[in-house]
């Protein structure tokens, strides 16, 4: 394995100055795409994801519709300028196709698709800048965009990542930690229902490390959830003020 250009963890401090249990700065905005039914932008540090939702609308072709529930389709894409890799193709890669499927499966437990028979809901996620944890930032953005679109939901899904760096469990992997760390654990969590909708494990984890990672992920997800809820509330409070006055 290649050595990282800088020490990832030194005296309990990570390369970017964070402690192991600290998220990067989280920024969330809702309603950022004017022509979408719902949209959101989520930043975890330098990683930025934008999600746009269209629907529910009639399924075409009709033979793909389901009589008792709606169909949700998710497309994850990394903008060609999102990474330093100049060879990034605008066409979907195998990884993008895989993550699109992962995101759909992580979102579906939160969506009441039975409310939308013979309909489809399209979710588009674009990574504008990538510095680790892109799939979990995308998951949070997509969940918020669905809520912004007024889709019936059981709960928001918040994505966070936990990893192993020099044998230490850390929250919210940045790009260096993602590339050079010993383990990666992206998770999706519904804070009100206290249920995981996504859990992928990469690397060698002991039982104690895994349990510590789950606890850290829940704390991180609950922190992000508060910011996400405030972003939704602020948007609709501002709309109400415009309609009814202060």
UniProtKB/Swiss-Prot annotation:
Q: Which UniProt keywords apply?
A: Cytoplasm, Exonuclease, Exosome, Hydrolase, Nuclease
Q: Which GO terms describe its molecular function?
A: 3'-5'-RNA exonuclease activity; RNA binding
Keyword Nuclease listed: yes
Q: Where in the cell is it found?
A: Cytoplasm
SUPFAM superfamilies in UniProt: Ribonuclease PH domain 2-like, Ribosomal protein S5 domain 2-like
Q: Name the Gene Ontology biological process terms.
A: gene expression; rRNA catabolic process
What GO terms fall under cellular component here? cytoplasmic exosome (RNase complex)
Protein task: Catalytic component of the exosome, which is a complex involved in RNA degradation. Has 3'->5' exoribonuclease activity. Can also synthesize heteromeric RNA-tails.
**Name of the protein this chain belongs to:** Exosome complex component Rrp41
InterPro entries named among the record's database cross-references: ExoRNase_PH_dom1, ExoRNase_PH_dom2, ExoRNase_PH_dom2_sf, PNPase/RNase_PH_dom_sf, Ribosomal_Su5_D2-typ_SF, RNase_PH, Rrp41
Q: Please state the Enzyme Commission number of this protein.
A: 3.1.13.-
Xref: PANTHER family = EXOSOME COMPLEX COMPONENT, EXOSOME COMPLEX COMPONENT RRP41
Superkingdom assignment? Archaea
Quaternary structure annotation from Swiss-Prot or TrEMBL: Component of the archaeal exosome complex. Forms a hexameric ring-like arrangement composed of 3 Rrp41-Rrp42 heterodimers. The hexameric ring associates with a trimer of Rrp4 and/or Csl4 subunits.
Does the keyword Hydrolase belong to this entry? yes
The main place the protein resides is cytoplasm
For this protein, the record's CDD domains field holds: RNase_PH_archRRP41
Name the protein family: Belongs to the RNase PH family. Rrp41 subfamily.
